[in-house]
Amino acid sequence: MFVLCFSVLFVLLSYLYRPVTTSRENICGFYAEKKNTLDMVYIGGSACYVYWEPLAAYDKYGFTSYNFATDAMPPQVIRYCMEEILKTQSPEVFLVDLRPFQYGDLYDEVTSSVNYKREAPIRNVTDNMNYSVNRAAMIENCVEGETAAYHFDIAKYHSLLISLITPRNWGYITNRHPMRSKGFHACESVEELYIEDVSHIKEKQRLSEEMDDLLTELLEYCKNKEQKVLFIVHAYQISEEDQKKYNYMEERIAEYGMDYLNTNDYAEEIGLEPSADFYNRDHVNLLGADKYTKFLGEYLVRNYTLPDKRNDSAYRRWTQEYKEWNGRMEEIRETLRLD
């Protein structure tokens, strides 16, 4: 009995001490969703959570979705995120952000490490998940070097005594906390960009050996799970080099008979305006997210069997959450239109 009580207390304290960040809000919000209620789950980095508006998609098309997304998500954790999601949800389709494979092996001068090995992006996932066998496997297989501090993350945060007196942290003590926007975060400013059309580039640039191996591992996992997956590239200020990498990824994905969509090839159809719809070169603002969600929502409805739940009484909560969310978003839209 003592061991059980100590274990429960240890886990709850670990959850309490974890800082409440965007990544934490998203993952704990996912845990708060009712079992088997999500039709689509979008996995990846910030390219997910500032682009896809789950509640807007529900209002317009009727299917439910969630952004299981963390800042700078590294590619090696994606299969474990899928495994975590499948514990409680049975989505018709997963959307997997391919940017982690594009930026994963880029060198970060601040940390003197390649991106996918950096501590912070890995912790954005591991330090917000429930303690479980899957989390332990993720840490052992995704972290280089000593792993104890990842398994027991309270060691990193125990000195943050402010957590004990912050009401917001107490709301996350069970690692479940409703996320009313379903993992979406609006970018509220504008950066004017010049975006070059690179859709004519058909050359392929092979990924590094590490990224190629991780992509293969993920494709094999999805194949074995017999899970529908759409591998997707969000629209941004893409370079020719990036486009060549995505062309290579498209070929690899096709070898496994899986779906691929590069929304940069549809920038005109989406209607993104470089002078008004971007937050920075890598992300859209709310106005851009509105357009991206409309395009992608229509694409998903055409290509996958997604139900319309708008008249289902079990999902009235989604209708109310949309109204509340959209009210807040309208204020941001007005500000962006004035900029």
Whereabouts are the PLM-identified features?
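Loop/turn elements at helix/coil->beta-strand transitions in domains of secreted/extracellular proteins
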Residues: 37-39, 62-64, 90-93, 223-230, ...
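Membrane-embedded segments
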Residues: 43, 47-134
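Alpha-helical transmembrane signal-anchor/signal-peptide segments
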Residues: 16-37
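Flexible, glycine-rich surface segments
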Residues: 187-274
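C-terminal regions of proteins
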Residues: 247-320, 326-327, 331-339
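Secreted/periplasmic serine-hydrolase-like ester/acetyl group-modifying domain
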Residues: 113-225, 309-339
